[in-house]
Amino acid sequence: MPRDIITLGCTECKQRNYTTTKNKKNTPQKLEFNKYCRFCQKHTLHKETK
């Protein structure tokens, strides 16, 4: 399967809040999104984790 499931973790509280998919051939770098963290109760940077 070309698309791999990845999780996005909050950089402030380290909670893993979101899952998404990505094609590792097209985007070899780690993904970063500004998303809402329900534990911090604000928008924070979420980075790709294992």
From Swiss-Prot:
GO terms for cellular component: cytoplasm; ribonucleoprotein complex; ribosome. Gene3D superfamilies: Ribosomal protein L33. GO terms for molecular function: structural constituent of ribosome. This is Large ribosomal subunit protein bL33. The gene is rpmG. The keyword Plastid does not apply. InterPro entries: Ribosomal_bL33, Ribosomal_bL33_CS, Ribosomal_bL33_sf, Ribosomal_zn-bd. One of its GO terms (biological process) is translation. Belongs to the bacterial ribosomal protein bL33 family. Keywords: Ribonucleoprotein, Ribosomal protein. Signal peptide: none annotated. The lineage of its organism: Bacteria, Pseudomonadati, Thermodesulfobacteriota, Desulfuromonadia, Geobacterales.
